[in-house]
Structures are given as C-alpha cells and as structure tokens.
C-alpha cells in the first residue's frame, strides 16, 4: 500500500498543475468517464484531477489496503472497533432484507425489528392522539434532549424532511447552556409537550442536566404524577430511567454495536419517526440499505462510497489538502455539513494507527460547510481565490417541493453549476483584462486591476445530483458518506469507530466544576486556568 501511495505522491506535483480546462477540451467524454450513478443519484468527479492513471492506482490502493476485506468484516459483525471490543453494525439497523446478522453467534435482527416495531407503535399513538398528556390533551410538541450523535442526526434529518412532517412539531435541545432549553420551553405548553431523553447510559451530563430542567417544567405545571405522561427515553439504563420517573413501556433501547454518530437509524431516530411517520421512516431506512448493498456488491470503479473515499484520501494524504467543504444547495440540508463534521472528524480525527504507532502523513480533514447560495456570500471568496486549495462537494436535487417556486429552484441549480464550473475553469489574466477594457477601462489601469480578477481555476469539486430530497434519498446520502468515512479510515489505518478524544475534556470538566462553584481551590491547575477562574468569579453575580 505504501508503495502505491508513493507512486501517487510522485505524480502529485504534475497533478496539482493539471489544467482541467485542457483536460475537458481534450476529452469530450471526460464527464461520462469520470461520473458514476446509483439509480437517480449521480456522482460527478470529472472536475477533480483524477485521470485514468490515478484511478488505476486508487483502485489498486483499495485492493492492497484491504478495504474490501475490512468491509466484509464490518458487515459480518466482527469487532472491528477493537479498542472497545465492539462490532460496528449500524448497517443492521437498516437491514431491510432481514438476512441474519450475527454478533457473538446471535442473530441481532429479531431485536432490531422488535425495537423498530415498538417505536412505530409509540409514534403512531402520539401522532394519532391516542396517547395523551396528563390532562387529556393530545401532544402537539416533541422535544428531544440529547447531545452529539443523539442530537445531530435527528436535528439534521428532521429539518431535511420538513415537507414530510405531518406529526407534532419537533424541537431539539442539546447544549448545557441553559439558554438553549429556556428558549425552547418558551415555545411550548406543558400539557401538550412530550420530552424524549436520549442517553444510552442516562448519565451524560449535558443531557441529564437538561432533562432535569424539563422534568421540573412538567412537575411544576402539572404535578409529579404527570411526569410519566410527558416523557419517553432512548436508553439501556432501565434502572436510572425508572428512577427518573419514566414508564418502562416508553423506553427504547439500542446496542453497544451502534456508535452515537451512526445512531440515527436506531431508536435515536424516534423524534424523526414521530415527525414523518413510521412509513416514511421505513423509506429512510430503505435508502440507506440500498447504498449498503451497492457498497458491498459494486466494482470499485462503479462504487460511489469507494470512489468518494478514495478521492478523499487522495486529496488529503497525497495532495495534502487539509479541509473539505460540504455545500448542499438545499436550505433544508443546512445541518448536513455539521452532521458530516461529526461523522467524519470524530471518526477519522485520529493520530494513532491500528498498530498503536503514529499515523504517517495525515488522517481525516477538517470538514465544514453551509448551504448554497448562502455560502457564496460568505466564504466562497477564499475557495475561489485563497492560497489554500479546498475540495468542494456540491449537492443539488433536480426537483423541489414547491412547484409554484420553480423559477427559484432553477436559479439555485444555475448557481451550483456555475460554482463548480468557475472552480474548474477560473479566469486568466487575459480574460480578466479583456472584460475590463470591453467596459471602457484604459490599458494601464486594466493591467493594474486585472490581477485581482484572476482565478487560477483547477480547484477540485465533486457534484451530487438526485431527483428529490425524499426520505429514501436522504437515507441514501447519509449512508454514502458513512461508508466514505469507513473507506478513508481503512486507508489511514486507524480505528474510525472509537472517540477517545472526547473523553479527556469531560474528565477535566468534572474536576473543574467544584472550582467554578467556589467549593475548591484552583490550586494545582495551570496559571491560565487559575486566571480564567478568577476572572469569571469576579464577574459572576
């Protein structure tokens, strides 16, 4: 594998100098040769520097790097998350074929289906008004309390699928900052509100602090006995859930082989199911399952997650590009970049290989983005003319949900196509100068101004096109990126499924709380921390 990486690196200088304009001019079939599709989902990577030789090397990299072997280990239930001795089976949660999936010799599918059925029954009862609040009123608002994977997925997907909402209004609380829950509680009435507390262990500090605030909100307005009518939980800690006052019939579990950032397919998706209904939630799972099958069966050169991961690895570890921009041209996908930020950076932000040795080269990139066209008026300037190359990944649906606003969607499409073309083509000095002189500017001034209007071009982008942002399409898109992260992680030779970097800050915060509360001295902490504690204490009222 290292030899192939070195071969790729030996071409890096030439690759960076690749003139994509010339490549398209020389090859009328470049788009068709460097784009692949799964049904209506098209991935165009022709505007990257990938050529026939690089693609062959990338395919060899996947083969020699053991990506296919590791892929089968994941799907078959092997404990590939070896630092926690856990299988990685979020794919089982959307295994619509019901093919047995074994963990320690036991088929997990009966349990998966049982939880899904219980979720569906509960969601239907809330949506229909059969399950009411303590005063006999139907539930009109559902507030999910969670953080990280228990929040980012449900928030993102619920917003993305807004056209399919026909259930109670959905709200989400995650931050331990009291302002977050305070602002949400102002929007609802206690007698018509259901809280879902999402915490596997029922000990997550942020979640349980907010849950206690929510409990007080209900108990103060409706009495202690009302708590059981206004809460549900997604957890495996049944004793703690019961102590909180939540009926065991309203508790939905999931398993150690489901990582938080991969948990939207599990009971963590309950608020989404309540919003869009069990049938649409099933279609969401169907879309992901279609990508799972494609990922397992399609040849590497026709395999969307494989190609996306290989190109991502190439950009990061061969060409050295430190970030990637996720740019969905869909306002309802406004939280998708943040969702992928966690998925990618928590998975592949590692510095140690599976052998326990330091990673050679780079691991995961910084992932960020905003929906178009908002981003065009914020940070695209740097993507077009900055000194860092930032690979861009665009997404656009051919059809929107507002037929009366078709012209606006056409404007959206024209913008995303223009951006990918502009990044590729750029603008030469001669073109910039001619544009100025055509407007009447004299030669001397045009020579001075034109350099500021030059775009180097050759800036890589990938564009995804699909029919419409349905539950099926969203499930497909998420699964595509999940498997992309997996492919890159295998090539980085890291464990993509633990997150020890999250733990240190938690431990230190626990120790600092008594200091912040004034119960203990800051002595023993560094001088900066001591100084900050003192400054905050002085300002506190």
UniProtKB/Swiss-Prot annotation:
List locations, semicolon-separated: Cytoplasm
What are the recorded GO MF terms, alphabetically?
carbohydrate derivative binding; glucose-6-phosphate isomerase activity; monosaccharide binding
Pathways per UniProt: Carbohydrate biosynthesis; gluconeogenesis; Carbohydrate degradation; glycolysis; D-glyceraldehyde 3-phosphate and glycerone phosphate from D-glucose: step 2/4
* Entry's Gene Ontology BP terms: gluconeogenesis; glucose 6-phosphate metabolic process; glycolytic process
**E.C. number:** 5.3.1.9
Which protein family is named in the record? Answer: Belongs to the GPI family.
In Swiss-Prot or TrEMBL terms, this protein is called Glucose-6-phosphate isomerase
Provenance organism: Rhizobium etli (strain CIAT 652)
């Amino acid at each position: 594998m290292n030899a192939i990486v070195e071969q790729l690196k030996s071409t890096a200088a030439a690759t960076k100098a690749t003139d994509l304009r010339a490549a398209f001019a020389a090859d009328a079939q470049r788009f068709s040769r460097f784009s692949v599709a799964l049904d209506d989902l098209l991935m165009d990577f022709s505007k990257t520097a990938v050529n026939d030789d690089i693609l062959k090397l990338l395919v060899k990299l996947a083969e020699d790097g053991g990506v296919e072997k590791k892929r089968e280990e994941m799907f078959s239930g092997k404990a590939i998350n070896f630092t926690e001795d856990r299988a990685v089976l979020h794919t089982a949660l959307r295994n619509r074929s019901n093919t047995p999936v074994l963990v320690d010799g036991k088929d997990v599918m009966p349990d998966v289906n049982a939880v899904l059925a219980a979720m569906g029954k509960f969601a239907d009862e809330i949506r229909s008004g059969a399950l009411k609040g303590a005063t006999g009123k139907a539930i009109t608002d559902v507030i999910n309390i969670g953080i990280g994977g228990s929040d980012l997925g449900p928030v993102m997907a619920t917003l993305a699928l807004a056209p399919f909402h026909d259930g109670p209004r959905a709200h989400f609380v995650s931050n331990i900052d009291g302002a977050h829950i305070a602002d949400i509680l102002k929007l609802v009435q206690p007698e018509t509100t259901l809280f879902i507390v999402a915490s596997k262990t029922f000990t997550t500090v942020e979640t349980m602090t907010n849950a206690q605030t929510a409990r007080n909100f209900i108990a103060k307005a409706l009495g202690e006995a009302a708590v059981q009518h206004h809460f549900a939980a997604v957890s495996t800690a049944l004793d703690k859930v019961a102590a909180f006052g939540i009926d065991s019939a309203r508790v939905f579990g999931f398993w150690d082989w489901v990582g938080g950032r991969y948990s939207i397919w599990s009971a963590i998706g309950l608020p989404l199911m309540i919003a869009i209904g069990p049938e649409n939630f099933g279609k969401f799972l169907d879309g992901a399952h279609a990508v799972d099958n494609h990922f397992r069966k399609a040849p590497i050169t026709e395999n969307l997650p494989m190609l996306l991961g290989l190109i991502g690895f190439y950009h990061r570890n061969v060409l050295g590009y430190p970030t990637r921009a996720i740019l969905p041209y869909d306002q309802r996908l406004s939280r998708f970049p943040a969702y992928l930020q966690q998925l990618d950076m928590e998975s592949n932000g590692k510095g140690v290989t599976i052998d326990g040795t330091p990673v050679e080269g780079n691991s995961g990139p910084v992932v960020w983005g905003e929906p178009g066209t908002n981003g065009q008026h914020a940070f695209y300037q740097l993507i077009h003319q900055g000194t860092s190359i930032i690979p861009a990944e665009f997404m656009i649906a051919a059809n929107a949900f507002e037929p009366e606003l078709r012209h606006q969607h056409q404007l959206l499409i024209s913008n995303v196509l223009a951006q990918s073309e502009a990044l590729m083509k750029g603008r030469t000095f001669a073109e910039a100068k001619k544009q100025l002189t055509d407007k009447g500017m004299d030669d001397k001034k045009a020579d001075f101004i034109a350099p500021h209007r030059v775009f180097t071009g050759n800036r890589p982008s990938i564009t995804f096109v699909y029919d419409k942002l349905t539950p099926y399409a969203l499930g497909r898109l998420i699964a595509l990126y999940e498997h992309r992260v997996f492919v890159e992680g295998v090539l980085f030779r890291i464990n993509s499924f633990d997150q020890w970097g999250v733990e240190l800050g938690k431990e230190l915060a626990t120790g600092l709380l008594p200091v912040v509360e004034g119960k203990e001295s800051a002595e023993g902490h560094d001088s900066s921390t001591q100084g900050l504690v003192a400054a905050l204490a002085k300002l506190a009222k």
